[in-house]
Every structure is written in structure tokens, then in C-alpha cells.
């Protein structure tokens, strides 16, 4: 073998070695995902997140997806396992999961999604849109004043408005306070009363009481209500009481109308934040909590027709 040929072979081997070295040095990431329970909105947010991150990072990323089955103790167990594994990031899908993650670690980046009120969830006294901690994410809060307008627009003669929600969910308590305030600001003269349940054991009895006393029921974005939407519908529909909801998944199960965000889009936005942190070194403590960019009015035609409720032209069918 002549010297020139030997040199070419050596150069080729060196180049190959450099390529192997570059590939082996490519960063890999593990993201732990904990979803509170199984229902459409949360699943769409998880899917949107995974799709976006997978599209951008490909084989560099793996996901450990866990469902807490609606149990707060399971949230803690799952999150603690992620921390022990030293995952690169945690996606906390819902408020209780976010709270568990924020308590478990101050070093692993935590992104929340399907979380309505970050200051309340994290017990932050001052709020300027960033947490200043290892936590950020996306909020699923649709404009609550517009939801209040929807109640008044669709059921203008209501004498009593019932707000049905789980008292154990901070998101729901926040939305209830905001809806009350918005109804008052809009000059609503109806009596507004809370009907709170503590979990699945008393949701039927509380819903029955609400249906017996109210002209319309409002359900905010509430995980327990979402998981029991069919039960709520089986009580409210025979009682001919319309239900207006804070998100699409609940509305499909028991409502007549909703002003909703796109949870898949919300997950995609959260995924964009994740890639920025993992690949670009963005500081999670300085990342502003983001929201879905679009909301839309939707209605369920079959239920509206049964109740004789006229729907304006700017609503879309569910």
C-alpha cells in the first residue's frame, strides 16, 4: 500500500471516529409525565406535549407516562419516583400533580399543564407571570368573564345560578370566585350559590340538590366533575336543568355549551417550553406561564333542542 493510499485510509478512519464521537455525545433526555386522571382534556394536553417534543427531539427523548387515577397519594408516589430516577424534566398535568412536584424537587425543571391558577397552586404572594422557581408551564384558564356572559346570554331569565364543583380542587375554587365576580360586574341579578362536593361519594347527592333548586348550573374546569360527567347528565337532563361548562370534555358529557380552549394546543405550547429548556438552556424560573392562544364557543345541539334553548350563530357544534 503506497503512502498516499495509507494517508487516505487514515483520514477516513479519523473522520468516521469523529462522526461516532459526535453521535455518542448527543444529549439524551428522560421526561417523567404524571397525569392526575383519565379524561379527554388531560389526555389531549399530554398528547400535544409528547407530539411536539418528539417531533423536535426524536430519539433523544424518552417518556415515562404515569396516571395517578385521581388519587393525591398516587401523585406523590409517582413524582417521588421521578425524582429518585433523576429525570431531566417533569410534566405535571393538573394542579395536584404540580403541587406534588413543586414540593418534591427544587432542582429538576417542572412544567405544569392543565393548571388554572399558578399563584394559588404554588402559594405565591407576589405574581408577575413567572414563579422564580424551578416551575413554569401553561394555564388552561379560559376567559372567565366571557363564560359569565355565556351564562347570561343563554339563560337570561335565570333566578338562581348554581356553581357545581369539587371543594378539594384549588382550580375550581379560583374559577368559582372569578365567575361570581364577573357575574356581579356584568349586572347579573340572579342568586348565585355554590354546590360543592368533596369527591365521588357525594357528587350525586349534591348534583341532585343543585338540579332541584337552580335554573342553570355552571361547572368550571374540574377534574372530578369531568370524570363523573355522565352521572351529572343523568341527574340534570331529566330535571331539565341546563349545564354550562368550563371546558369541552365536561360539556360533551353533561353540558349544553362551553367556552373552551384546545388542550392539544396547550400541550404543544408546553412542549415548546420543554424543548427550549432542554436544548437551549432556557431558565425555567424566568419563563412566563403561558396560555392557549384561541378559545371558541361550542354547544351540544341535541341537549339544546331538548331544552328549547336557542343558540347564537357564533357557536360551533360539539
Task: For the regions a language model picked out, list residue spans one by one.
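Hydrophobic alpha-helical segments within soluble ligand-binding/sensing domains
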Residues: 118-160, 261-282
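Short beta-strand elements in bilobed, periplasmic/extracellular small-molecule ligand-binding domains
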Residues: 50, 55-75, 134, 180-200
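Beta-alpha junction/loop-to-helix N-cap segments that form part of ligand/metal-binding clefts
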Residues: 65-125, 222-246
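Pocket-lining segment of extracytoplasmic ligand-binding domains
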Residues: 171-241, 247
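Extracytoplasmic "Venus flytrap"
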Residues: 30-50, 56-58, 64-74, 168-172, ...
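An alpha-beta-alpha
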Residues: 31-33, 49, 136-186, 283, ...
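Flexible loop/turn connectors
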Residues: 250-302
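Short, low-complexity disordered leader/linker segments with a strong preference
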Residues: 1-30, 55
Amino acid at each position: 500500500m503506497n503512502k498516499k493510499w495509507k494517508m487516505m485510509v487514515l483520514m477516513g478512519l479519523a473522520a468516521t471516529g469523529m462522526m461516532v464521537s459526535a453521535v455518542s455525545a448527543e444529549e439524551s433526555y428522560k421526561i417523567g409525565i404524571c397525569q392526575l386522571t383519565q379524561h379527554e382534556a388531560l389526555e389531549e394536553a399530554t398528547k400535544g406535549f409528547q407530539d411536539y417534543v418528539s417531533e423536535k427531539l426524536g430519539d433523544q427523548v424518552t417518556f415515562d407516562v404515569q396516571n395517578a387515577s385521581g388519587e393525591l397519594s398516587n401523585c406523590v408516589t409517582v413524582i417521588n419516583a421521578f425524582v429518585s430516577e433523576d429525570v431531566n424534566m417533569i410534566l405535571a398535568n393538573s394542579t395536584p400533580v404540580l403541587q406534588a412536584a413543586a414540593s418534591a424537587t427544587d432542582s429538576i425543571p417542572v412544567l405544569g399543564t392543565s393548571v388554572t391558577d399558578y399563584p394559588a397552586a404554588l402559594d405565591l404572594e407576589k405574581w408577575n407571570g413567572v414563579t422564580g422557581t424551578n416551575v413554569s408551564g401553561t394555564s388552561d384558564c379560559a376567559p372567565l368573564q366571557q363564560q359569565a356572559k355565556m351564562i347570561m346570554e343563554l339563560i337570561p331569565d335565570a333566578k338562581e345560578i348554581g356553581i357545581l364543583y369539587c371543594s378539594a380542587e384549588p382550580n375550581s375554587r379560583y374559577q368559582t370566585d372569578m365567575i361570581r365576580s364577573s357575574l356581579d360586574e356584568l349586572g347579573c341579578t340572579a342568586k348565585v350559590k355554590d354546590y360543592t362536593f368533596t369527591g365521588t361519594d357525594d357528587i350525586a347527592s349534591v348534583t341532585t340538590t343543585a338540579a332541584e333548586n337552580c335554573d342553570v348550573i355552571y361547572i368550571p374546569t374540574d377534574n372530578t366533575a369531568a370524570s363523573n360527567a355522565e352521572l351529572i347528565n343523568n341527574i340534570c337532563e331529566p330535571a331539565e336543568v341546563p349545564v354550562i361548562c368550563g371546558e369541552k370534555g365536561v360539556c360533551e358529557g353533561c353540558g349544553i355549551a362551553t367556552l373552551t380552549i384546545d388542550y392539544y394546543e396547550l400541550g404543544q405550547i408546553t412542549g415548546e417550553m420543554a424543548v427550549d429548556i432542554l436544548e437551549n438552556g432556557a431558565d425555567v424560573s424566568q419563563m412566563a406561564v403561558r396560555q392557549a392562544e384561541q378559545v371558541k364557543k361550542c354547544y351540544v345541539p341535541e341537549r339544546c333542542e331538548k331544552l328549547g334553548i336557542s343558540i347564537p350563530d357564533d357557536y360551533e357544534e360539539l
